Amino acid sequence: MASAGKPTLDDSRRATGSPKMKARENAKDTLCRNVTIYGRCRYEDKGCAFNHDPHKVNTTYQSDSRRRLNVDSPSFTPSLLSSNGSSPTTASVTAKKAATISPKAANAAPFQPRNITSRSNTSTPSGRAETMTPDWSVAEVQEFVPQGFDTAHMASLQGNSNGGVPSTSPFDPFVTASNPLSAASAVGPVQANPFAHDTAAAAAALGGAFFAGQSGFQQPVQYHLYAPIGPHSQNTLGYQRNVHDLFLPNDFREELQKKAAATLQTLPNTQLPAQVDYFHSLVPLDLNHQKNATIFGFPSWVYKAQSSKDGNFYALRRLEGFRLTNEKAIRSVQAWKRVCNGSVVTVHDAFTSRSFQDSSLIFVTDYHPLSKTLAEQHLGAGNRFQGRHNTHIPEQVLWGYMTQIANGLKAIHSNGLAARILDPSKVLVTGKNRIRLNACAIMDVVQYDTQRSIAELQRQDLVNFGQLIVTLGANTPSVMHNPTKAMEHFTRAYSPQLKNSVFWLLNGLQKDQDRNIDIFITGISSQLMSTFDSALHLDDELTSDLSRELENGRLVRLVTKLNFVNERPEYEHDRQWSENGERYFLKMFRDYVFHQVDAQGDPVVDLGHVLSCLNKLDAGTDEKITLVSRDEQSCFVVSYKDIKKALESSFQALLKPTRRLH
């Protein structure tokens, strides 16, 4: 049995009876599998005995079938059955050569050109010398570049019908031979190449059929990665980071939190009415509890209140003891509702009320928490250190105030109205160098019967504007009692351009020339550009801060998915669903993140550990961790990538429609 299973050396050298050599004789009619799988054979020029032309294989099979069916066909050996590259004319010569073949010749077959048909008719042994000299050059073989398809490339794979040597094209892994015995199906259906960058060229090469003008596929955004958005004002090295690169700036965060706390502030055990019309939860905002009727002619108070209609917070300004004599006076507030400007506090409503046990006039405006007035900010109003000297206002800050006030006056005058009040105690500072005109609609109701034209009131606004700037520049509220001394101080402290602009405003009542807010804005256009540039820088800074808070709820989504899967009592009538398979080590991962204990058995409450684990889970890193069950009988060594895959698959299983049993 051993001798029969292992042939001797003499038997292996007998080519006539060896099935191995018989297979090699038929190799010229067999299409190389490398062409079918990869599109070309890398050993085609290094001794591969199989055929590398699909078109020729089909022709050979068809010719063989015709010869077998034709009784008049002569008896001769086809040239394609040659195994050594020579072209003998008789079957006896072929058998003789096959009988005397050496083992070295079997292992290293001579080169066979692709278009072997052109040399198959030679009947002399001199054909061996021709086959040893290749008729192609290395320059014809192009390196594979995964670009779009072209018709020449497809034609070269399908074969050349005129018998010439086909041009060598780059290998394309997306073109395969589906049937090696059929020339029509030698090349499979052309699919889209995802590595091609020019989809339009590919569509044009294929005739434009079934190609829509759409963009290429893009991977989804990884929400656990944050791209730094400019501007980048700090020159730091690549490995350096600071707190502001990761979180919201502390001062900005504290400011927003303080404003939120001030908005939600309540005053228990107050003597204020519980409800004023449709407002409730009143909180006084005045710092001075003394009655002052200098500005409006009536004592005024300011409150914060919440609306019962929309739940928003508003500021209520109450004029104490006001009696409405003309109903048209309060209707004049409707015109102020159309004024929508960033430098003017928006007016929403006005009504009379007896909730304060008197006749009061209530104005409803926007509420800006923690805002101050210009008098409190620069003139020391409401400050307990009244004797301390106020700081000098920089000229650039003063120009910023002027441009914002001019912006508000232009919006008011464009609607056919007049501000009528430009006092430091009625201009709010809602942010850093950010001001808004307040209490503008009150005088239209209080002094409704005063017969003054709108043009005259608008010119008076210019004069009040100039007096406000002089008061701020002199740092004292009583400066207008001595205008000459005030202007001398203003001239010494500020530039001639600012001084000339203020002089122009103070002369607004003169009728020698036309004076309006548009002419004034044209005169300070250079400063408007500076203020506009500062606003653009602030917008960039806020956008950069906002980008750090992008997708800040991703960890909450992870914890939510974990809680959906863990400890689920039943799913599809399976009470052990959350305890089997990949859901089991999700439960162990939950214990690893939240239920760790130290060496003494005390709970470990470490927010940094929780955030680190959840961030790694969100990223799906390859870091491996050891998960141990509660009874210490099971232990898993898994990566965060595996845990993320298990979490997603378990969560997607919950989203599938349930199968109902009937």
UniProtKB/Swiss-Prot annotation:
Homodimer. Forms a heterotrimer with a catalytic subunit pan2 to form the poly(A)-nuclease (PAN) deadenylation complex. Interacts (via PAM-2 motif) with poly(A)-binding protein pab1 (via PABC domain), conferring substrate specificity of the enzyme complex. This is PAN2-PAN3 deadenylation complex subunit PAN3. SUPFAM superfamilies: Protein kinase-like (PK-like) (SSF56112). It comes from Aspergillus oryzae (strain ATCC 42149 / RIB 40) (Yellow koji mold). The keyword Zinc-finger applies. HAMAP family: PAN3. Residues 72-85, 114-126 have a biased composition (Polar residues). Residues 526-564 form a coiled coil. It is found in: Cytoplasm. Its main location: cytoplasm. Residues 1-26, 59-131 are annotated as: Disordered. Residues 265-525 are annotated as: Pseudokinase domain. The lineage of its organism: Eukaryota, Fungi, Dikarya, Ascomycota, Pezizomycotina. Residues 86-102 have a biased composition (Low complexity).
